[in-house]
UniProtKB/Swiss-Prot annotation:
The record marks C156 as: May be catalytically important. GO terms for molecular function: GTP cyclohydrolase I activity. Pathway: Cofactor biosynthesis; 7,8-dihydroneopterin triphosphate biosynthesis; 7,8-dihydroneopterin triphosphate from GTP: step 1/1. One of its GO terms (biological process) is tetrahydrofolate biosynthetic process. HAMAP family: GTP_cyclohydrol_B (MF_01527_B). The keyword DNA-binding does not apply. This is GTP cyclohydrolase FolE2. Belongs to the GTP cyclohydrolase IV family. Keywords: Hydrolase.
Amino acid sequence: MNSPIDPALVMPDVQSSADTRHIPIQRVGIRGVRHPMLVAGADGAPQPTVANWTLTVALPAEEKGTHMSRFVALLEKYRSVPMTPALFAAMARDMLPLLHAERGDITAAFPYFINKSAPVSGVQSLLDYEVQWIARAAGDQVEFELVVQVPVTSLCPCSKAISEYGAHNQRSHVTVSVVLNGDLAMDRIIRLVEDEGSCELWGLLKRPDEKFVTERAYDNPKFVEDLVRDVAARLAAHPGVARYRVEAENFESIHNHSAYAVVEG
């Protein structure tokens, strides 16, 4: 025969108690969680990385607290699964019943690497890109947003036009945010942005490659305005893009400030 449980040994579940202030919370959860992640690359092979995670849900006015430990349990469930945008959206959908919530968001920010061949020598090296995946779940509906920062070279058209010996150029960051309603791979977006810079970047270049990069940028000058417009035009023409935001920052080599532009569509 089982002995009765001593009430003194039963731990109270304070967070499940009712709240009397009647104020709903739009987002509550965990933030700044560093956790391993497998990202399915363009070739389908999983790329291990470490992401900075934010997971939140909406909390009704009558509930005192959410179940914080369940967010980490969800991360553990998906830790060894190669992530695609579709699976990331499914993860956000799974979070809602787990947390007894009607709405919730998941954000994962991580470095992503592409192996690139230098333009002349063909020597291979990795280049890193800063990426965010964002899933916003409401009931059975999930909106997926991809944010990727692509470094490129920009060369000033005005400087080229007025100078006899060259033109000032610099590294630029083009940050693209897209809400997808169809298929558009992350690698294709990165390639699209790199095509619209004065020249793309590589991790490792030999002297013949440096010559190519210098001359390629000189033959393809672009203002920061050109950068955002050209990338926006490419995105607007793609049927898989529902909304987009293109942001470019040129770290000017002849000024102590940046040139900056944004296009939204």
